[in-house]
């Protein structure tokens, strides 16, 4: 959920909810080793805490990450994690609906929330002296949420309108929705984060409360605080607020989900829509995530995606835009931050009249050439430098740091793995890139989607 709960604080880029999870890859976890190391500890009730010092401005970002997302929903209840995210702003017995948000607004801060396949998060960015108040609010709603039908049902309508805006009225989002459903035949990543419309329409107060009581607890969460703070000085306040919330012993320590069978055949999806102005070709490959990959594979996939898909020097751009002039743009992203098997996505915007078959052949040729022929050392060095530079520049955003650590820890990475990501990128070799391309970028592991304009004449209604 986004704009409805945003309040102004200059310089902060709001997180996306559905389309960020559906259409794009979140930033790879990254931090340079020159930054102060995060401080981590765990409370007696199981709450994990990560404190990231950043003393440049007297501002702090608090994020609470719950280890539950759309992939943890009961079949038939898709969209429930995202629906509950909306409802978490409806107040508690101690703090009526709106008081939390009004307090953030009054101090000149910003708040929002986001839902992903694997996690749900809530954050506030406020002046340093308001952190204790934010802790009290957030700890209270961890188990104190009060829901009534009179505010649950209207919020369901808000979610449905969000679905209309982000998916139903966006042909490219609908294509990605269908690609994901085809890519994951068995795993719940095949369900959209926002849910299927016909299931959203049936979600109830009882559904939301049951999900809340099952998953929202300190031993299923990580608190991330980034900003002008000292870990030892704020720990007593964390103990005073979050430390008083009882744990939920029934929550399993590991997530058990149905896994994908070995892919046996390539799949295709075609979506025709009269509203399409720019056709698209998207290909998604089923690949390991940072938590399921063998040693060295995840950073190699990061570099591979950058090599073939980012910028005007990328191999796909050179082949399809410059050489063959089949496309106006190309892109490739690797979604590494996930609990289970993830994807590497290729996107091509064709030139008018370009043949999809020719574009597919060109994509295949780029991958085949990368596998069979030596990767120039200057290309490898360039893309690794780009990735590491992006990590350095991103440190200007305090909230991006909190997001990197929160997302990484929540899917199962250690703080050291996140912090040392640049070193892992530096260590990637050309042979490793060729190995992961050969192993994972094969047609049988892919779904190719075509977005085309529907030129079928509209049917005229029969008159009696």
Regions found by a protein language model. Give the residues of each.
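Hydrophobic helical h-region of N-terminal Sec-dependent signal peptides
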Residues: 13-19
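N-terminal secretory signal peptides that target proteins for export/translocation
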Residues: 1-8
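Active-site SXXK
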Residues: 78-92
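Non-catalytic beta-strand/loop surface segments
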Residues: 28-70, 96-129, 166-220, 244-291, ...
């Amino acid at each position: 959920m986004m704009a409805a709960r945003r309040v102004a604080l200059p310089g902060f880029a709001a997180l996306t909810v559905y389309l960020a999870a559906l259409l794009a890859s979140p930033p790879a976890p990254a931090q340079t080793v020159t930054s102060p190391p995060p401080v981590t500890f765990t409370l007696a009730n199981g709450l994990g805490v990560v404190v990231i010092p950043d003393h440049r401005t007297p501002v702090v970002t608090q994020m609470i990450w719950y280890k539950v997302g759309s992939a943890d929903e009961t079949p038939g209840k898709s969209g429930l994690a995202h629906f509950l995210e909306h409802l978490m702003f409806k107040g508690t017995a101690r703090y009526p609906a709106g008081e939390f948000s009004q307090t953030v607004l009054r101090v000149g801060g910003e708040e929002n929330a986001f839902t992903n396949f694997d996690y749900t998060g809530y954050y506030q960015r406020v002046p340093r002296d308001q952190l204790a108040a934010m802790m009290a609010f957030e700890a209270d709603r961890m188990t104190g949420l009060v829901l009534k039908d009179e505010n649950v049902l209207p919020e369901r309508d808000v979610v449905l309108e969000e679905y209309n805006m982000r998916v139903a009225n966006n042909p490219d989002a609908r294509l990605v929705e269908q690609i994901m459903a085809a890519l994951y035949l068995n795993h719940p990543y095949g369900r959209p984060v926002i849910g299927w419309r016909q299931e959203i329409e049936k979600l109830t107060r009882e559904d939301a409360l049951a999900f809340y009581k099952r998953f929202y607890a300190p031993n299923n969460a990580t608190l991330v605080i980034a900003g002008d703070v000292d870990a030892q000085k704020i720990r007593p306040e964390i103990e005073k607020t979050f430390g008083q919330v009882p744990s939920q012993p029934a929550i399993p320590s590991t997530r058990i989900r149905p896994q994908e069978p070995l892919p046996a055949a390539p799949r295709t999806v075609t979506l025709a829509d009269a509203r399409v102005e720019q056709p698209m070709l998207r290909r998604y490959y089923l690949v390991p995530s940072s938590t399921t990959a063998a040693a060295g594979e995840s950073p190699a996939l990061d570099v591979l995606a950058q090599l073939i898909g980012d910028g005007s020097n990328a191999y796909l751009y050179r082949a399809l835009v410059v050489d063959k002039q089949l496309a106006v743009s190309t892109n490739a992203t690797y979604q590494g931050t996930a609990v289970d098997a993830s994807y590497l996505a290729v996107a091509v915007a064709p030139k008018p009249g370009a043949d999809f078959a020719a574009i597919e052949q060109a994509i295949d040729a780029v991958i085949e050439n990368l596998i069979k022929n030596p990767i120039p050392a200057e290309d490898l060095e360039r893309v690794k430098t780009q990735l590491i530079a992006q990590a350095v520049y991103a440190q200007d955003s305090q909230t991006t740091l909190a997001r990197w650590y929160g997302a990484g820890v929540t899917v199962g990475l250690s703080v050291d793995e996140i912090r040392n990501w640049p070193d892992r990128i530096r260590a990637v070799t050309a042979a490793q890139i060729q190995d992961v391309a050969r192993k994972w970028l094969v047609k049988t592991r892919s779904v190719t989607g075509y977005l085309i304009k529907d030129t079928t004449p509209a049917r005229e209604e029969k008159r009696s």
